[in-house]
């Protein structure tokens, strides 16, 4: 289950919600930006490590991806079934509501294998 490191059953255990989360480092976010990705995401409630590794530079993924490169961040992705089925390649379809000025949006992504 190497692809799934996030929420799992935390939704069912509310005492763990917001208690901390793993995530990629700024170095990983810089690598993704160098590859000109459109979006990056995780199965955690925050893309970045929480609590931050460096309190002087919290949430480096948000700074590098969103602010500096305009790359979308997808959080709380449900990847457990993909990991369980060893699916590494799929068509990713993402529709979003058109809301002017929004900085966050509830989305309904689909992975088609």
Annotate each PLM feature.
Residues 1-7, 11:
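Single conserved hydrophobic/aromatic residue that forms the stacking wall/gate
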Residues 8-9, 46-48, 99:
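Solvent-exposed loop/turn segments at secondary-structure junctions
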Residues 4-5, 42, 76, 93-95, ...:
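Generic beta-strand/beta-sheet core signal
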Residues 12, 49-51, 102:
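Extracytoplasmic/secreted cell-surface and envelope-processing proteins
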Residues 80-113:
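C-terminal regulatory/interaction regions
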Residues 22-56, 63-83:
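Extended C-terminal subregions enriched in glycine
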Residues 12-26:
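Active-site-proximal segments of metal-dependent phosphoesterases and phosphodiesterases across multiple
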